[in-house]
């Protein structure tokens, strides 16, 4: 098994790239090394060819790589730092790719970060793995013949979404396979906490690239049969059931004694032209949270529920609250460490249901510290959402926004997963399959960041578990929408 791989890697300068080139040329599977340079006068490196490109992310660059690749396999390395393969690792990747006739394979790896060698596992690719920031690692091995065929179907000319479009095209016909073995070592580039990276798709400076990602994802949904037309919505009958109150705020809580009082006060101080209440599902707190909630017991609007079971996650607590007979026509969420940003949050959220005939409404929030001082990334308004294509674009982004509110009868017909992550996103996907989601672009909630946030800085294993689960949710919803379209076509 010799000389079966053409390798392509970004070229910044000779000194930075030379060690990686030497390591690659020492591997007997490597036939050719091609440097992707953005300058025509870049200094050559002995033993390498050079391909001048405008960038490393465009359709033009992807197609140029495919056109220049001649060996059985094409390897693309996406970082500028040193790359070192494990013993017989390239042979392993080639064998797996051949054995299963994959279009693309990728692997777990080690990463140097802060002077230490750390494990960097990645996750399996699924049909619903449609996030544009899916982490394949920095090394991807393509079957060259399949790479060329996939690029022949790339008709759009993207500046930022070239690689994203390529893997969507590959996935339509070929296997994208994860090798759960540590096969190489690279250097970490993005050292931000997971709680910071999740907002990248909401950053206004990424609007142009995110629009490209949306276009690529939408085209993919059309190809696989999961695209939903903007006119295909069911109407919501807001008089289908009678409720004692118009609106209920739901707060699931576990051990948040330092912040729960602020959350309760922000709810009970709401000014609304209708009757509302607050249901707190206290999931067996042991730090004084229960007693803190009881300080407000004199207010008849407060319903304090302690479950008689011990197997509820955040989703299960939501289900318990909304299926309680005291729940109102609309249920609006509030995290136990957050507060409403305005005394008119409930009024504006409820009004949006009627305005858009929506089964679910999402607001806008601002990220603050515990003292309500705004901090990066600031206001998260999800302006990537559009009434026409929002429910399709929801597959490629990683959240629906907040605060989240639901029309209770439709919620009760589905309920959300009994998990501590992704449960709201799952409901957003499920509801928008058939109904409209409304949006409020004024700040409704202050999402407070403090030292006890559960999602501020996850380790790689927890982050992977969360992403794997969310991709599973997307996969199920993708199949549900394909079935919906098939059944509609039969009628």
Mark where each language-model region is:
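Short, acidic, metal-binding catalytic loop of nucleotide-sugar glycosyltransferases
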Residues: 22-31, 265-275
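Glycine-rich, basic loop-to-helix element that forms the pyrophosphate-binding segment
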Residues: 55-69, 308-326
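A conserved acidic beta->alpha catalytic loop
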Residues: 37-44, 82, 282-291, 310
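A conserved hydrophobic helix/loop-capping motif in glycosyltransferases and polysaccharide synthases
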Residues: 5-16, 27, 38, 247-259, ...
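A recurrent flexible, glycine/aromatic-enriched loop bordering the glycosyltransferase active site
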Residues: 118-142, 384-405
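Acidic donor-binding loop at a coil-to-helix junction in glycosyltransferase catalytic cores
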Residues: 157-166, 420-427
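Short beta-strand-to-loop acidic/aromatic patch adjacent to the donor-nucleotide binding site
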Residues: 71-84, 328-339
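Conserved donor NDP-sugar-binding/catalytic core segment of glycosyltransferases
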Residues: 82, 87-119, 344-377
């Amino acid at each position: 098994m010799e000389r079966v791989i053409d390798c392509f890697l970004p070229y910044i300068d000779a000194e930075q790239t030379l060690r990686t080139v030497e390591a690659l040329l020492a591997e007997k599977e490597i036939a050719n090394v091609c440097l992707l340079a953005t300058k025509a006068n870049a200094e050559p490196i002995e033993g390498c060819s050079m391909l001048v490109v405008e960038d490393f992310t465009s359709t033009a660059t992807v197609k140029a790589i495919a056109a220049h690749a001649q060996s059985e396999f094409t390897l693309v390395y996406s970082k500028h730092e040193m790359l070192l393969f494990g013993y017989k690792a390239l042979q392993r990747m080639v064998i797996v790719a051949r054995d299963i006739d994959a279009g693309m394979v990728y692997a777990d790896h080690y990463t140097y970060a802060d002077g230490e060698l750390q494990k960097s596992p990645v996750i399996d690719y699924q049909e619903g793995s449609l996030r544009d920031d899916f982490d394949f690692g920095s090394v991807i091995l393509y079957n060259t013949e399949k790479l060329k065929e996939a690029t022949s179907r790339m008709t759009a000319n993207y500046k930022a979404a070239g690689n994203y479009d390529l893997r969507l095209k590959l996935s339509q016909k070929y296997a994208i396979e994860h090798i759960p073995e540590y096969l190489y070592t690279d250097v970490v580039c993005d050292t931000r906490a997971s709680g910071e990276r999740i907002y990248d798709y909401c950053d206004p400076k990424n609007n142009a690239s995110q629009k490209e990602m949306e276009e690529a994802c939408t085209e993919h949904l059309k190809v696989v049969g999961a695209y939903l037309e903007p006119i295909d919505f069911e109407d919501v009958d807001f008089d289908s059931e009678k409720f004692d109150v118009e609106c209920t705020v739901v707060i699931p809580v576990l051990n948040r004694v330092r912040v729960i009082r602020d959350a309760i006060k922000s709810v009970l101080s709401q000014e609304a032209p209708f009757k509302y209440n607050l249901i707190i599902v206290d999931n067996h707190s042991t730090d004084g949270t229960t007693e803190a909630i009881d300080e407000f017991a004199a207010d008849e609007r407060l319903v304090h529920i302690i479950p008689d079971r011990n197997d509820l996650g955040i989703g299960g607590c939501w289900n318990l609250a909304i299926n309680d007979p005291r729940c109102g026509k609309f249920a609006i969420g509030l995290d136990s460490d957050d507060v409403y940003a305005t005394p008119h949050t409930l009024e504006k959220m409820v009004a949006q249901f009627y305005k858009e005939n929506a089964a679910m409404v999402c607001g806008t929030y601002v990220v603050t510290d515990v003292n309500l001082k705004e901090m990066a990334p600031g206001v998260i308004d999800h302006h990537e959402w559009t009434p026409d294509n929002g429910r399709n674009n929801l597959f490629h982004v990683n959240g629906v926004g907040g605060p989240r509110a639901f029309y209770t009868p439709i919620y009760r017909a589905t309920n959300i997963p009994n998990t501590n992550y992704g449960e709201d996103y799952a409901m957003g996907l499920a509801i928008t399959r058939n109904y409209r989601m409304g949006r409020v672009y004024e700040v409704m909630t202050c999402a407070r960041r403090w030292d006890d946030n559960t999602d501020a800085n996850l380790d790689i294993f927890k982050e992977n578990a969360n992403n794997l689960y969310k991709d599973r949710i997307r996969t199920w919803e993708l199949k549900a929408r394909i079935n919906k379209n098939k059944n509609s076509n039969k009628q």
